[in-house]
Amino acid sequence: MADQLTEEQIAEFKEAFSLFDKDGDGTITTKELGTVMRSLGQNPTEAELQDMINEVDADGNGTIDFPEFLTMMARKMKDTDSEEEIREAFRVFDKDGNGYISAAELRYVMTNLGEKLTDEXVDEMIREADIDGDGQVNYEEFVQMMTAK
């Protein structure tokens, strides 16, 4: 879901994430979330903060990492997703511009996003999106993956 964001949006969210991640350890805790929300004039309870974290905490470790944060932001923007945004996202992944996303290109972009993926995990992501079985993802397959509910 986060891969439907443009490079510019991802950069903006990285900045926002850094504002929350006070100690710079790559995760947002309930304490850090509370600090930022209070600085924005909100007054969430500890339980509310925990609920907000749990909502996006995919791996269940009690904190939000950047990929989880991106997923949350992407969800909020999902309704405004246009064909142009999807095409732009495809271009971000299709580094050599040949119309296909290879495993190497996917790995490169994911690594730049701070995702440390094994070759198996990258191959698995390609397989899931690769409808025609050619080992890479073309634009149509990418659109299918991005618009799948």
Swiss-Prot record:
Keyword Calcium among UniProt keywords: yes
InterPro entries the record matches: CALM/Myosin/TropC-like, EF-hand-dom_pair, EF_Hand_1_Ca_BS, EF_hand_dom
Modified residues (N-acetylalanine): A2
Residues annotated to bind Ca(2+) 4: D130, D132, D134, Q136, E141
Residues that hold Ca(2+) 1 according to the record: D21, D23, D25, T27, E32
Molecular function via GO: calcium ion binding
Sequence ranges assigned to domain EF-hand in this UniProt record: 8-43, 44-79, 81-116, 117-149
Key words, A-Z: Acetylation, Calcium, Metal-binding, Methylation, Repeat
UniProt cross-references to Pfam families, sorted A to Z: EF-hand_7
Signal keyword on record: no
Any one of the GO CC terms: myosin II complex
Domain of life: Eukaryota
SUPFAM superfamilies, sorted: EF-hand
Residues where Ca(2+) 2 binds: D57, D59, N61, T63, E68
Function: Calmodulin acts as part of a calcium signal transduction pathway by mediating the control of a large number of enzymes, ion channels, aquaporins and other proteins through calcium-binding. Calcium-binding is required for the activation of calmodulin. Among the enzymes to be stimulated by the calmodulin-calcium complex are a number of protein kinases, such as myosin light-chain kinases and calmodulin-dependent protein kinase type II (CaMK2), and phosphatases.
Additional facts recorded: This protein has four functional calcium-binding sites.
Similarity comment text for this entry: Belongs to the calmodulin family.
UniProt protein name: Calmodulin
Organism the protein comes from: Oreochromis mossambicus (Mozambique tilapia)
